[in-house]
Amino acid sequence: MKILLIDDHKLFSQSIKMILELSENIKKVQLVDNFSTISEIAFNDYDIILIDINLTSLYQADGLTLAQEIIDNGCSSKVVILTGYSKKMYEHRAKAMGAYGFLDKSMNPDELVKKLEK
């Protein structure tokens, strides 16, 4: 499985990458902290795109807006929202737009890997 992680917090991203790469089922984890067009993301060959809701320094809008644009551009990857914010506040919007999942950043690392491997 190939995963793209879009998050503007480098320390968090690097930690998650190290955890995910310990899984036998995850072959590649690519970190994105800079991009200029949606097509750079949407049309690469990833199984899952993990997107943080708060992308202040990366993108002109929030992660949900970026996720919606990726989905609307016909990306075949599963888009999963990753957040440290209240689930109730954003989960309904994420599901309504077609996101595959919604995960909490404070989740146990083993649980995160299990959910992504489903």
For each feature predicted by the language model, list its residue ranges.
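C-terminal output helix
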Residues: 89, 107-116
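Conserved acidic carboxylate
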Residues: 7
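Active-site residues of response regulator receiver
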Residues: 52-54
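Acidic, metal-coordinating helix/loop segments flanking the phosphotransfer/catalytic sites
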Residues: 31-48
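Two-component/phosphorelay signaling modules centered on CheY-like receiver
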Residues: 10-30
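Short amphipathic alpha-helix used as the core "switch/output" element in two-component signaling
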Residues: 61-76
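Alpha4 helix (beta4-alpha4-beta5 surface) of REC/receiver domains from two-component response regulators
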Residues: 61, 86-103
